[in-house]
């Protein structure tokens, strides 16, 4: 089977493993990595990816699969990363093998590796047959992880001046609230204002109109203008108006979903602004 990232063919599980740090933004450990494989114009491609703490298996599997169904998953792969002895992982591996979601989709194959590092061995724990049904391809049964530094996702990180963090905690630390320009009371007031505006627009009111269609049109049209005002992360951290507008976008899933396409179209500006939001507001903004 050939699978692709946007520009790079993937021919073995090792190739997938080598791309995981660049996809997640950190090197996971003691984790189960679920990867959806879906059809694309060029064959199969990697779709959404999810990481679970081993202690969350199998409890969180259904929630992950529900999210995967937002795409068009045909195959689900799992990679278990752990330093534990295989006997200690038996219950986890068995629950992965037995799992089937509400639509009947299960995990087609699972591999075990001690860690994500170049030349680390991986082994198939269950799945995946060849087209003839005679058994797995040798490279899909066992192998070693190729150079992580040359994987497509890692090269994309380097090209953008980034490197994956060593741990998930290090990654989360980047988003910890640390805006030095506003006092706690000011931030709380900004958060309340953002939530109220989002709720008002969700109800079809705003921009001087009570026509829900016009509200949506104005909201979407504002994205381009707001992003054009973003010059840097530091300036976004200082700008109360930009922070409030972006916080309003993130306050409900409804507003977030309306603007997400335009945010993705301007990754540098949107990235700086949303990082400023993450470093300013302490609580989760998404309520609906």
Segments the model singles out, each with a brief description of its role:
Residues 32-36:
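Short beta-strand scaffold segments in enzyme catalytic cores
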Residues 2-22, 27-29, 47-285:
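Charged, compositionally biased boundary regions
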Residues 288:
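Calmodulin-binding IQ motif helices
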Residues 37-42, 114-116:
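Short acidic-glycine loop/turn motifs at beta-strand connectors
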């Amino acid at each position: 089977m050939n699978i692709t990232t946007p520009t790079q063919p993937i021919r073995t599980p090792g190739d997938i493993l080598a791309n995981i740090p660049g996809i997640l933004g950190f090197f996971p450990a003691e984790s189960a990595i679920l990867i959806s494989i879906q059809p694309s114009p060029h064959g199969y491609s990697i779709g959404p990816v999810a990481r679970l703490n081993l202690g969350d298996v199998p409890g969180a599997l259904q929630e992950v699969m529900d999210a995967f169904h937002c795409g068009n998953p045909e195959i689900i792969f799992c990679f278990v990363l752990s330093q534990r002895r295989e006997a200690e992982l038996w219950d986890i591996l068995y629950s992965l093998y037995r799992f089937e979601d509400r639509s009947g989709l299960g995990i087609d194959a699972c591999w075990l590796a001690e860690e994500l590092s170049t030349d680390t061995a991986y082994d198939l724990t269950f799945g995946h047959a060849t087209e003839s049904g005679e058994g797995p391809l040798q490279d899909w049964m066992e192998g070693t992880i190729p150079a992580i530094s040359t994987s497509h996702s890692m090269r994309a990180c380097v090209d953008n001046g980034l490197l994956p963090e060593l741990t998930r905690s290090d990654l989360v630390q980047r988003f910890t609230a640390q805006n030095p320009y506003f006092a706690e009371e000011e931030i709380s007031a900004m958060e309340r204002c953002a939530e109220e505006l989002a709720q008002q627009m969700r109800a079809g009111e705003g921009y001087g109109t009570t026509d829900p269609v016009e509200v949506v049109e104005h909201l979407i049209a504002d994205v381009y203008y707001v992003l054009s005002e973003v010059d840097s992360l530091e300036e976004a951290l200082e700008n109360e108006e930009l922070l409030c507008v972006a916080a309003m976008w993130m306050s409900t899933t409804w507003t977030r979903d309306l603007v997400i396409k335009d945010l993705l179209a301007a990754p540098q500006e949107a990235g700086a602004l949303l990082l400023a939001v993450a470093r300013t507001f302490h609580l989760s903004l998404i309520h609906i």
